[in-house]
């Protein structure tokens, strides 16, 4: 009887958990992760979504602990634990992909305002610390031993007009995408409106990334 009572008392809490950990947010996180993984450049950090997911994870952890203490059916608890693990994995993967891009295009992001603004505050701190650490390391081990004309971490020499040592994402990379709605040439970048004139809803399209940057940023397209 005690076990049955414990099971019944846990049901409202599990119902609250189910309400809060909405499928919509999990699917949105999947979409954000796929977009980030497929895009050659860093995308806008999904701050509101990440905050909601963190709150849902915290509640899920509490529910699992309470359910175990109340001797709720182990199978039920394991299902909730699996759902929790899946959400945590997605969130970690989302962070990991973004950090990899920040490390790869570190200097380019920091010198490009609109890209820097796409980072979270924590990511901006990480990027600046990486820049300082990398700059100090290269200066101590290599650059300080080179002639003055070749001591820049950004340029091959002082005669270079641009930062030719800074890698940039290749926006001419081809990606697979799917439109959430019908798109006409007005939905794409004006410079490329002749390259891509329309896109049907839910139709997979293999296209140059820079052609679909605008609708992607507006949430009209998802990458695959």
Give residue spans per PLM region.
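Surface-exposed beta-strand edges and their flanking turn/coil or helix-capping segments
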Residues: 99, 106, 117, 189-192, ...
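Charge/polar-rich, low-complexity and marginally structured segments
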Residues: 2-184
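C-terminal structured interaction module
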Residues: 191-224
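Short basic/aromatic-enriched segments
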Residues: 175, 182-198
């Amino acid at each position: 009887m005690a076990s049955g009572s414990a099971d019944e008392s846990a049901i409202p809490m599990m119902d609250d958990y189910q309400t809060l950990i909405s499928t919509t947010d999990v699917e949105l996180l999947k979409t954000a992760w796929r977009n980030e993984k497929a895009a050659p450049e860093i995308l806008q950090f999904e701050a509101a979504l990440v905050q909601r997911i963190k709150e849902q994870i915290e509640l899920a952890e509490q529910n699992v602990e309470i359910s175990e203490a109340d001797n709720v059916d182990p199978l039920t608890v394991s299902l909730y634990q699996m759902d929790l693990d899946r959400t945590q994995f997605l969130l970690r993967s989302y962070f990991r992909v973004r950090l990899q891009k920040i490390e790869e295009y570190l200097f380019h992001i920091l010198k490009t305002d609109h890209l820097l603004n796409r980072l979270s505050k924590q990511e901006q701190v990480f990027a600046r610390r990486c820049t300082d650490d990398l700059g100090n390391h290269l200066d101590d081990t290599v650059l300080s031993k080179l002639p003055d004309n070749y001591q820049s971490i950004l340029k091959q020499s002082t005669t270079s007009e641009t930062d030719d040592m800074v890698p940039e994402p290749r926006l001419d990379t081809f990606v697979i995408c799917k439109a959430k709605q019908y798109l006409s040439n007005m939905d794409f970048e004006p410079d490329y409106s002749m390259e891509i004139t329309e896109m049907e809803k839910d139709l997979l399209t293999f296209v140059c990334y820079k052609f679909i940057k605008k609708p992607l940023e507006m949430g009209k397209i998802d990458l695959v």
